């Protein structure tokens, strides 16, 4: 989908400068990893144990430094980023709302590093994002209202209820976004992909899509530490790592499958 001439993404303002950007690797020519290359340098790094500190906001996608990885069919490295990838956020706790002929995407996350990654991922798709702290040391990341997101909203919304489209499937880039927003390791050999607490109508279809991607998981209800799908076993975790690609620079150690 062409992003030129659609919506107001070019006029959107970058996130407030209250969030230190991680140091970036020296850019190298070649295939983009998770989006367009960063320009310039950034200062400091995010606090992984608390809310963002004063600093400059990251506006470009992080580089993973894993250019030697072999591409996996349907993996995050196998295609350029598109707006359709944002369905991965809606598979998790992301929300989309419509206003007139436009739509806005938002997601609440539980750690500062996730803000870095999501702002960069949205920027790589031509969507400027803002963020703000919320209750419980969480952060809300959201786009502006834009016509670019109207097809995504039309596919996922039935009235105001979020529901996956009939042909929904999970690619590496969709999984990468879901994991960046709401993926949590569960040692020694598990990984949780968290769901929207009010999205019960989505859970079964999301589980089917995970199974089709080779990531059949166990649905955990709210009383079991969820809602989330638990992915277990070395083979499935290796498959997850292949599909989502290497960790973004802002990711804390052990927070990403490898």
Where is each model-derived feature located?
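Internal intein/HINT superfamily modules and their associated LAGLIDADG
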Residues: 1-258
């Amino acid at each position: 989908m062409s992003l030129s001439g659609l919506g107001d993404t070019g006029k959107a303002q970058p996130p407030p400068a209250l969030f230190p950007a991680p140091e970036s690797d020296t850019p190298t020519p070649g295939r983009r990893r998770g989006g367009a290359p960063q320009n310039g340098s950034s200062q400091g790094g995010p606090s992984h144990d608390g809310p963002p500190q004063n600093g400059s906001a990251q506006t470009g996608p992080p580089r993973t430094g894993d250019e030697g990885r072999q591409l996996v069919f349907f993996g995050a490295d196998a295609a350029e980023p598109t707006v359709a990838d944002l369905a991965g956020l809606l598979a998790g706790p992301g929300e989309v709302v419509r206003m007139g002929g436009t739509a806005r995407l938002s997601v609440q996350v539980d750690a500062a590093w996730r803000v870095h990654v999501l702002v960069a991922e949205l920027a790589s798709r031509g969507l400027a994002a803002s963020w703000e702290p919320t209750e419980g040391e969480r952060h809300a990341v959201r786009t502006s209202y834009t016509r670019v997101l109207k097809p995504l909203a039309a596919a996922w919304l039935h009235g105001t209820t979020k529901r996956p489209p009939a042909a929904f499937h999970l690619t590496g880039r969709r999984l990468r976004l879901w994991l960046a927003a709401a993926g949590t390791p569960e040692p020694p050999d598990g990984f949780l992909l968290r769901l929207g607490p009010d999205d019960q109508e989505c859970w079964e279809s999301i589980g089917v899509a995970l199974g089709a991607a080779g990531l059949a998981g166990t649905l955990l209800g709210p009383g079991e530490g969820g809602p989330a799908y638990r992915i277990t076993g070395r083979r499935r975790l290796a498959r997850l790592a292949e599909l989502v690609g290497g960790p973004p620079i802002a990711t804390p150690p052990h927070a990403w499958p490898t």
